[in-house]
Amino acid sequence: MTHLRFDNRLRQQLPGDPEEGSRRREVSVAWSAVLPTPVAAPSLIAHSAEMAQVLGLDAAEIASAQFAQVFGGNALYPGMQPWAVNYGGHQFGHWAGQLGDGRAISLGEAIGTDGGRYELQLKGAGPTPYSRGADGRAVLRSSIREFLCSEAMHHLGVPTTRALSLVGTGDAVVRDMFYDGHPQREPGAIVCRVAPSFIRFGNFELPSARGDIALLRQWVDFTIARDFPALAGAGEALYAGWFAQVCERTAVMVAHWMRVGFVHGVMNTDNMSILGLTIDYGPYGWVDDYDPDWTPNTTDAQGRRYRFGTQPQVAYWNLGRLAQALAPLFPDQAPLQHGLDRFRDTYLACDRHDTAAKLGLAECRDEDLQLIDALRALMRESEMDMTLTFRGLIDLSPDHPDPAQLREAFYDEDKRVADAPQLQQWLQRYAARLQQDPLPPDARRARMRLANPRYVLRNYLAQQAIDRAEQGDPSGVQELLEVMRHPYDDQPGRDAFAARRPEWARDRAGCSMLSCSS
């Protein structure tokens, strides 16, 4: 018997759909009750021991057949009351109307051992009223990617939803991976995602777009009371303080993305968390050879709206859509603009902090922003790996800056040789700056190690684990998870996980470009 205790405030305090079941429908409520659809043979593939501990689940319970049944969608623990949430959103810059949880079903809000609230949500557990004709399922490859990235991002220090479990369903799912007319049967899986809240910008956009100001206000009041309890005040002042905090949290999240080289890939407003958490791991990727114009999403290959370098601007635009949705609650629009200004101020402050940390400086001067921009330009021109470049700078000697320190960061040997003079020039400039800085060498290196990961979840690493799992060997998933639990540490015997992208992965599906098919 589980020790999980549930307090399902969302279902209790927001208006729900009087009809139950997964029949497709437009509704003017916050949520719909829907049960997961049973699967043939649920089996646990991997789990996060840390997340289980927070929830109070011990090893015996995780290993039990009942656990796989519950988190495979075949059973419920006492207190679980499954629901799917209704929301809208802007997708690739255009209003898309009602969207909702098309294949995500929340089981309940569990109270953790730390007293925190943790919503447990199954992704791939079958159709809901918001599935828009789809089957509500997920394939193993995308589920592995979501499971691993949720935990990898947490250990990188990036605000994120978490993952408790990855369960194979024993059923096949038909998907056309690149929407090119070649559907295939793939193994199915279900991820249990965990977050204090899965509320998105789109939860506020939909009722506002429909003119349902009463429901909009209910969403705002509920969100503040449950998820922002420290906020004080009332009325418009309370709403203004809340919106400013949403903007600040979003800025912090995106600044972390830019620090570690993460590209979300599909920053639609329905994929933006009101808590400033990274949510919905689809066609994401990590920057290998530095390119601010890179996106891993094939759907965005032409427009590149969601490319790496524009993520801060897109986040600001998305917050603008949220402000637009909230405008009916504000007689004076000035507080909304103030919130948007807080995003810019917070992001710039984070960027300066991260610049100092990544370069090992006590503080960031204005000229240091120029210094790091010059490095980025050099990385782009010379096809240098972002992660390996910054990590390689840690052990650089300010007295004898040697370009050989960064040899492993180059993808093209000819460019390494040709661009050696420019790199030497930049290193000398950097070394001169270090000699002016008050941080002792040991403190500098320690600061840099905490800002520049050695291990990131490169797409080719995830794909190797997927390949093994699809052949019946899931051990690679847990092994990769263990590596990503300590991304800033040097891990003896695990150098292969820190290597730059191999040439075979440059253009391979799943390693360079991905689709939204999952």
UniProtKB/Swiss-Prot annotation:
InterPro entries: SelO (IPR003846). It comes from the Bacteria. Keywords: ATP-binding, Magnesium, Manganese, Metal-binding, Nucleotide-binding, Nucleotidyltransferase, Transferase. It catalyses: L-seryl-[protein] + ATP = 3-O-(5'-adenylyl)-L-seryl-[protein] + diphosphate; L-threonyl-[protein] + ATP = 3-O-(5'-adenylyl)-L-threonyl-[protein] + diphosphate; L-tyrosyl-[protein] + ATP = O-(5'-adenylyl)-L-tyrosyl-[protein] + diphosphate; L-histidyl-[protein] + UTP = N(tele)-(5'-uridylyl)-L-histidyl-[protein] + diphosphate. Pfam families: SelO. Disulfide bonds: none annotated. Coiled coil: none annotated. Residues 1-10 have a biased composition (Basic and acidic residues). The active site is at D270. GO terms for molecular function: AMPylase activity; ATP binding; magnesium ion binding. This is Protein nucleotidyltransferase YdiU.
